[in-house]
Amino acid sequence: MQKNYVIGFPRIGEKRELKKVLEKYWAKQTDFNEVKYVAEQLKKRHWNYQKEAKIEFISSNDFSYYDNMLDTSILLGAIPKRFESLKDEELYFTMARGNETCVAMEMTKWFNTNYHYIVPEISKDTKFTLNSKKVIEEYKEALELGIKTKIN
């Protein structure tokens, strides 16, 4: 018996909903609760699309507000010292975009394609600590819809 799965699902939304709400957030025209709401709606919609298409192994932890490599840095606690005083979405987006006092992490092309990613900053002083909050929350979100996911 064959089984099927999707490695990951596009996150931006058919009408670029994620991009639009993030731009409003960065312009201080909305708060992060609106961003989270849009993200939750997109994840639900995308998981249900896959369920309706009879995908047997649906992924969770494939959604990102900005960048999967940045998500991995957060997951592993690989936070550069200049960001240590920040937390939650302020930490996340400052690592990606910088702010008045912190320079953003480097962004570079993925294998010479037009896709860019945030380059992790790892040194001998990096203290790795697991932060599985996002992974567990997304798994539980899908479970509430009756979808038991494989975790990316």
Range-by-range predicted roles:
Residues 1-152:
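Domain-level signal for soluble alpha/beta catalytic cores
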